[in-house]
Amino acid sequence: MAAASSLHAAPRVGSSSSFSSSSSAGRRSASAARSVRVAAAAGSCAARRAGGRMVARAAVASKAESPASAASSKSDGHEVLLFEALREALIEEMKEDPTVCVFGEDVGHYGGSYKVTKGLAEMFGDLRVLDTPIAENSFTGMGVGAAMKGLRPVVEGMNMGFLLLAYNQISNNCGMLHYTSGGQFKIPIVIRGPGGVGRQLGAEHSQRLESYFQSIPGLQMVACSTPYNAKGLMKAAIRSENPVVLFEHVLLYNLKEKIPDEEYVLCLEEAEMVRPGEHVTILTYSRMRYHVMQAAKTLVNKGYDPEVIDIRSLKPFDLHTIGNSIKKTHRVLIVEECMRTGGIGASLRSAIIDNFWDYLDAPIMCLSSQDVPTPYAAPLEDATVVQPAQIVAAVEQICQ
């Protein structure tokens, strides 16, 4: 992969409203100042490594249902919705680096299908916030080409399901060009957008494409679940020299949380300890984090002490954090909204068996969505997705 660390970004220079005002000479002259900022961000990431492996921050190991990092407690901070946190990340990075740009359908003056990019066109101009035709293969390919030429594009899919139309560009170009060019090209592109099972959006708008993208060489994948990690992961993804797919769940955009006023960047390869426990390790991500925490309340009342980890990094997995938890609890439950066949849970189960088999006292259980197209009718839709009661029953079975 282009760079093992997600924060080894190119030197970043001052704000600009257009690409033309940032010449190569200007970027070189400002590189020293900008590299200090990038090095500081990379240092904060490296500080959480142990022997080159990512470790979970003790600061987030609280038993709250939606814990923010301890960083948010160090200042008064401000409350934002998740989609606003994503927007803040885009604004901050676009102000600092004139090579950051946004492509997609209605991302400009309309502000995106979920208003993540609202106001960006007025701030940065139509050259950097570019409305495109309804042609995912075209503007995704354009983003890959822009990344090859030194820009840092953020490509928005109006819905993750529509990005299947750009699968060729994401797979054969985005993921592989660094390798097939012999390292001549880096592809610092972010591909993001809403996905997951919403509320009666129908099969075509309820896609979970994690399983589609995980097998593509060269891609990193992360899934945000709170305003805090949405902003931190977005900033890290933009700075990465690797292509990053950022999954945003359609039902989480209106989550509200207080985040720090000061700048912060998260590590792309790091899981989050949501709730420490002793009896069983529950691994989850995205929307299922909240189903798991709802189930955890019931489990605590029944005398169980589950440890909940939001894996966040879907590729690669943070096996250091996951492994430390398994060595403590010796039992694992994986909860995902992805399909069971070939899903993230299947890959995670395989990785755990390969690396931590000797520490398991019970078979790994995996709760996934049913392998069916998502129904439109609400009761049927709910029946295809993992519910808190199923999580409680699974933990009781594992801990027998």
Curated annotation (Swiss-Prot):
It is found in: Plastid, Chloroplast. K(+) binds at I189, A237, I238, N242. Residues 1-57 form a transit peptide. GO terms for cellular component: chloroplast. Thiamine diphosphate binds at E136. Residues 1-34 are annotated as: Disordered. Keywords: Chloroplast, Metal-binding, Oxidoreductase, Plastid, Potassium, Pyruvate, Thiamine pyrophosphate, Transit peptide. GO terms for molecular function: metal ion binding; pyruvate dehydrogenase (acetyl-transferring) activity. Coiled coil: none annotated. Gene3D superfamilies: 3.40.50.920, 3.40.50.970. InterPro entries: THDP-binding, Transketo_C/PFOR_II, Transketolase-like_Pyr-bd, Transketolase_C. The keyword Transport does not apply. Its cofactor is thiamine diphosphate. Transmembrane segments: none annotated. Residues 9-34 have a biased composition (Low complexity). It catalyses: N(6)-[(R)-lipoyl]-L-lysyl-[protein] + pyruvate + H(+) = N(6)-[(R)-S(8)-acetyldihydrolipoyl]-L-lysyl-[protein] + CO2. Its EC number is 1.2.4.1. It comes from the Eukaryota. GO terms for biological process: pyruvate decarboxylation to acetyl-CoA. PANTHER family: PYRUVATE DEHYDROGENASE E1 COMPONENT BETA SUBUNIT, PYRUVATE DEHYDROGENASE E1 COMPONENT SUBUNIT BETA. Tetramer of 2 alpha and 2 beta subunits. The pyruvate dehydrogenase complex catalyzes the overall conversion of pyruvate to acetyl-CoA and CO(2). It contains multiple copies of three enzymatic components: pyruvate dehydrogenase (E1), dihydrolipoamide acetyltransferase (E2) and lipoamide dehydrogenase (E3). This is Pyruvate dehydrogenase E1 component subunit beta-4, chloroplastic.
